[in-house]
């Protein structure tokens, strides 16, 4: 009997059911993955008991000798995998990391140019409902209506017109490669700081599957889960020592008190795992799987935003399928496939309904699935969406998905 089962049977039952859901449902949520048992062991360790306000060697509490080792390991490993000079591993989240960057060099009312949420950006990049949209003047940019991809000449034009203090590149639902070098040139043209948010593609960057922004951006932020397969948390990479000093002050005492030392330990484990050849192979396979799934869906008549993918995710515009993103998400769920509704470029529906779904391959790749399975999954997706109101067919598809998942256990 586990400690949780003995102490809190109700919670234990919920965790047990969640474990079963993760095992037998097909996870195509682009921002989710499976952390290793080693990462989870670090997260559940006695390090959760320790307060450690400040930074390694300069704490406001005694008894930090060993948690200093954990943080030092996380920093050194992050520097190595990203080929970076300055890293802060204390942010509790990706949004918090972005907030720290803004507060380190901007003041309220300054102008930030960032990707519109409905075109693939992120809430923390300036959405009106986010702190970023409330505190700063946001100039949104989007994709070309013709190509559904970024048009860098248009971005240059917009930057010159608005002269932002900061430009944010990176996205939560953009399937194509981002040219960080061109973003640097645009930022330099108007004297803006450049922040690259690589929360979604960090694992791909580490493995060399996607170009790195580190040589170009003043700041790089990321979550440590998603393609990195670590614990839920954030990191910040700074280009210079002066910027790193600003970041450290913005994180603590600016935004946070005590860092989560058990999570930082989990980050250290994940960064070590990211140095392995297996990790690199998985990132390469993640993109191969995404390209295969995208190709198969396109051949079945689905409208794939921008026509292809260069990374771990794809966006499906469902307008030609006469189904909303909300209804497609529900149908897929009944078929045992977990995805999320998503706005598409030039969206006409509300964010609660949407015209699209976002699909990603990190989690199923971590399970060991490859191109052959992607072809099967495309069939299951087509069946679910074209039979969204037929519970019998959806149930039969769910059985097939369960059988597929049973051949690729999450934790062997």
Curated annotation (Swiss-Prot):
GO terms for molecular function: glycine hydroxymethyltransferase activity; pyridoxal phosphate binding. (6S)-5,6,7,8-tetrahydrofolate binds at residues 117, 121-123, 242, 350-352. It is found in: Cytoplasm. GO terms for biological process: glycine biosynthetic process from serine; tetrahydrofolate interconversion. Disulfide bonds: none annotated. Pfam families: SHMT. Keywords: Amino-acid biosynthesis, Cytoplasm, One-carbon metabolism, Pyridoxal phosphate, Transferase. The keyword Transferase applies. Its EC number is 2.1.2.1. It catalyses: (6R)-5,10-methylene-5,6,7,8-tetrahydrofolate + glycine + H2O = (6S)-5,6,7,8-tetrahydrofolate + L-serine. The keyword Amino-acid biosynthesis applies. The modification N6-(pyridoxal phosphate)lysine is found at residue 226. Its cofactor is pyridoxal 5'-phosphate. Pathway: One-carbon metabolism; tetrahydrofolate interconversion; Amino-acid biosynthesis; glycine biosynthesis; glycine from L-serine: step 1/1. GO terms for cellular component: cytoplasm. Belongs to the SHMT family. PANTHER family: SERINE HYDROXYMETHYLTRANSFERASE, SERINE HYDROXYMETHYLTRANSFERASE 1. HAMAP family: SHMT (MF_00051). Homodimer. This is Serine hydroxymethyltransferase.
